[in-house]
């Protein structure tokens, strides 16, 4: 035992000497000639790489801070924490604590109706908490701790973390990464430009050298190359299969000569053939190709094409007017033009079909005869842009204009058409060029609106054009984003709700399933049970029936109830046990908006059983997003009433002008939904034969008792939501997903 002691002492002396030689004395300073130099980009990047842990600690340092939670409008809270010292916490962990080893958390409030609470994580009041829990986890195997103890330790480690703050920290980190990517991309672009310049210089240098050194040699070797190519071609085309392949690429005259030669060549074996004959023929053909290869092929090709067009003009004429060709492209073009003009969707593709016929016929007549140039040019211009008035008069003044239309006699007495109605200007000149029976057969498909026809007075044509353009809804850019332009308009009064149609059986007794009315696809979103934090997505109804989910979203905050909706790519729900409503962006996967309902009558102690409806219920109809929740009636005797409010889908704000206090009372109805601005409520959720016993119209501020039959097929309906895109009610009935068709009175 005495031998290792001198070694230890020697090692200590060596370490002390090395440390003393490497560390400068404390009283010395840097020499005056050493100046501070600005760091370069490499130094900055190296410092960033070395200080990664420091950056993370700076960003995550406020996790251990104490948080104050306040409730009330004029409430101000402040938390004062006196934590333990590190020596004190070590004494507590060792079991030798003193009287002065304690921490305090004080709450300072200001305001009349103020409630404050201080949330202090263990790491904020006890600096040794993290080391203590880490030591316990390391000793878990030796002490044989139970799983519950480990879970408690992990919960304590995550206690006090705020996911919104975590999102902000992640955003900061992403910002730093974006800056790094920008710098790297700039450097890469500079390097790529430099490399391109170097490559161009090398290419130009090589081209110069190649031209100087190899031009004479190339010219001298050209005859040798040509002779070698001719010999190779003669040897290759000596076989019959190669000769056929060569003849297919020759012109018509060469094919005729080759066919005559081929009739005699198969009778001779390949070994008996003389090499001089195909060699002479090959040289002769190569000479013809070198002289005019392109001219021969081009002339032959264009002559054949033009002759076919001249012979088939009548067939194309019939095909175009029969609607069998050239229609799809014009229909697509006409639909795009209708969207640009913002007209209503009352025109049919038949209008475009006749437009295509007129345009084609006008071009054919212009090519066939030059006696009517004004008519052809006017008809063609009426398809591309609004035609002049004089051209329209010339087109419509033909004798057949008033005799071909036997049915719509109230439309055709006018001989002048507004220049702004492009499609109708192209339709009406049609009888002057097409036989009457063809147009009369297709006439019922053409919708002719009375608003689009002008009068007999020339000075009123401008007014008629204005009326024609105003026949459809002229929408402003702000109104184009309205939901009614995507999913349609209201169908007026609700008349009947059909019986339920069971689509699937999935999940627990309570839950909700929904579709996004503004989405182009048919994705289905499911929340299983009335409490949780996982939203499941299915690609379509068939995948939902098969149980094949395509995506899942782990929400940062749990939801409660079944009154959620998916609207315009976001999930709207009520945060569990709070007055908060949340908008969660499904594409970006983050909380896009957050709001608090200050007047909601929220039950602090919510029982863990289904109440028959959700306290906070979202709804979607043709007008947008709605919110239904209980509140205290300030105008009455502080009784609870059900409030219906139009919700801003962007920031979750409400307006007093679009908020109504209904006659519903909590726990006196089953489920509710909104259709065309009217709130409907079902009287029971657990009776098979229920009724829609209440309706509140936001347009007239009136309430009625409609007494419409509503069937709860499985006698336990926990969700009813209206989808304005499908005109269906989506319901969750005792683990069954059912739909109801909505029938309107008008």
From Swiss-Prot:
Q: What post-translational changes are documented for it?
A: O-glycosylated and N-glycosylated.
Q: Which residues form the signal peptide?
A: 1-20
Disulfide bonding pattern of the chain: 490-676
- Taking every annotated instance into account, which residue ranges of this chain make up the domain Olfactomedin-like? 489-746
Q: Where is this region: Disordered?
A: 346-393, 454-479
- Tissues/organs with expression: Broadly expressed. Within the eye, present in ganglion cells, inner nuclear layers, inner segment of photoreceptor layers and retinal pigment epithelium (at protein level).
List the carbohydrate attachment sites: 187, 213, 691
Which Pfam family is one of this chain's hits? OLF
Sequence ranges of Low complexity compositional bias: 346-382
Annotated GO CC locations: extracellular matrix; extracellular region
Location(s) in or outside the cell? Secreted
Q: Sorted alphabetically, which keywords does the UniProt record give?
A: Coiled coil, Disulfide bond, Glycoprotein, Secreted, Signal
Any one GO BP annotation for this protein? extracellular matrix organization
Using the record for this protein, list the coiled-coil segments as residue ranges, or answer none.
43-68, 179-213
| Chief location category | secreted
Q: Name one GO molecular function term.
A: extracellular matrix binding
**Alphabetical list of PANTHER family matching this protein:** OLFACTOMEDIN-LIKE PROTEIN 2B, OLFACTOMEDIN-RELATED
Q: How does it assemble?
A: Homodimer. Binds to heparin and chondroitin sulfate E.
What's the protein here called?
A: Olfactomedin-like protein 2B
Q: Which organism is it from?
A: Mus musculus (Mouse)
Biological classification of the source: Eukaryota, Metazoa, Chordata, Craniata, Vertebrata
Tell me the gene name.
Olfml2b
């Amino acid at each position: 035992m005495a031998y290792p002691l001198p070694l230890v002492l020697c090692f200590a002396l060596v370490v002390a000497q090395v440390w003393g030689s490497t560390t400068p004395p404390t009283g010395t300073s840097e020499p005056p000639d050493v100046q501070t130099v600005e760091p370069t980009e490499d130094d900055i990047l190296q410092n960033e790489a070395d200080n990664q842990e420091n950056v993370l600690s700076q960003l995550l340092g406020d996790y251990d801070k104490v948080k104050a939670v306040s409730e009330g409008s004029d409430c101000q809270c402040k938390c004062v924490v006196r934590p333990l010292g590190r020596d004190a916490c070590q004494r507590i962990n060792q079991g030798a604590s003193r009287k002065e080893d304690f921490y305090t958390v004080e709450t300072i409030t200001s305001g009349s109706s103020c409630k404050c609470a201080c949330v202090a994580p263990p790491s904020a009041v006890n600096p040794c908490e993290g080391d203590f829990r880490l030591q316990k986890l390391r000793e878990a195997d030796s002490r044989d701790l139970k799983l519950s103890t480990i879970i408690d330790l992990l919960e304590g480690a995550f206690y006090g973390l705020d996911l919104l703050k975590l999102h902000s920290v992640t955003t900061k980190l992403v910002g730093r990464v974006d800056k790094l990517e920008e710098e790297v991309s700039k450097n890469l672009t500079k390097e790529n430009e430099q490399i391109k310049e170097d490559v161009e210089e090398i290419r130009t240098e090589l081209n110069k050298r190649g031209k100087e050194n190899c031009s004479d040699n190339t010219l001298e070797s050209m005859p040798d190359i040509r002779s070698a190519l001719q010999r190779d071609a003669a040897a290759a085309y000596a076989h019959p299969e190669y000769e056929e392949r060569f003849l297919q690429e020759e012109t018509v005259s060469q094919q005729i000569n080759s066919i005559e030669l081929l009739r005699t060549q198969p009778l001779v074996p390949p070994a008996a053939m003389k090499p001089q004959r195909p060699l002479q023929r090959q040289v002769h053909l190569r000479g013809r190709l070198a002289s005019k290869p392109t001219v021969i092929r081009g002339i032959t090709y264009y002559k054949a094409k033009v002759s076919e067009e001249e012979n088939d003009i009548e067939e194309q004429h019939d095909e175009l007017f029969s609607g069998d060709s050239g229609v799809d492209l014009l229909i697509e073009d006409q639909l795009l033009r209708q969207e640009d003009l913002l007209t209503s969707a009352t025109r049919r593709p038949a209008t475009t079909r006749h437009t295509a016929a007129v345009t084609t016929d006008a071009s054919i007549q212009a090519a066939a005869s030059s006696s009517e140039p004004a008519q052809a040019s006017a008809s063609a211009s009426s398809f591309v842009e609004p035609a002049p008035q004089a051209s329209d008069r010339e087109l419509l003044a033909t004798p057949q204009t008033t005799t071909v239309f036997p049915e719509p006699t109230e439309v055709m007495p006018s001989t002048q058409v507004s220049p702004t109605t492009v499609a109708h200007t192209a339709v009406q000149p049609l009888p002057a060029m097409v036989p009457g029976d063809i147009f009369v057969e297709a006439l019922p498909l053409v919708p002719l609106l009375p608003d689009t026809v002008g009068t007999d007075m020339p000075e009123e044509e401008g007014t008629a054009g204005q009326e024609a353009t105003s026949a459809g809804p002229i929408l402003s850019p702000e109104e184009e984003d309205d939901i009614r332009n995507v999913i349609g308009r209201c169908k007026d009064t609700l008349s009947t709700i059909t019986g339920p149609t069971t689509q699937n059986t999935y999940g627990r007794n309570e839950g909700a399933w929904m579709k996004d009315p503004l989405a182009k696809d048919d994705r289905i979103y499911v929340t299983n049970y009335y409490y949780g934090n996982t939203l499941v997505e299915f690609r379509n109804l068939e995948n939902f029936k098969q149980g094949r989910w395509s995506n899942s979203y782990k929400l940062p905050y749990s939801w409660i109830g079944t009154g959620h909706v998916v609207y315009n790519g976001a999930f709207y729900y009520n945060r569990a046990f709070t007055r908060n409503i949340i908008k969660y962006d499904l594409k970006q996967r983050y909380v896009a908006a957050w709001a608090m309902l200050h007047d909601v009558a929220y039950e602090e102690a919510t029982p863990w059983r289904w109440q028959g409806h959700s306290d906070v219920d979202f709804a979607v109809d043709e007008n947008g997003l709605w919110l239904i929740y209980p509140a205290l009636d300030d105008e009455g005797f502080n009784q609870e009433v059900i409030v219906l409010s139009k919700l801003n889908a962007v920031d979750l704000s409400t307006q007093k002008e679009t908020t109504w206090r209904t006659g519903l009372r909590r726990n006196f109805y089953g489920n509710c939904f909104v259709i065309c601005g009217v709130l409907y409520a079902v009287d029971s959720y657990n009776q098979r034969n229920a009724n829609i016993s209440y309706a509140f119209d936001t347009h007239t501020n009136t309430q009625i008792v409609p007494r419409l039959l509503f069937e709860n097929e499985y006698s336990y309906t926990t969700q009813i939501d209206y989808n304005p895109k499908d005109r269906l009610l989506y319901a969750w009935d005792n683990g069954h997903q059912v739909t109801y068709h909505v029938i309107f009175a008008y």
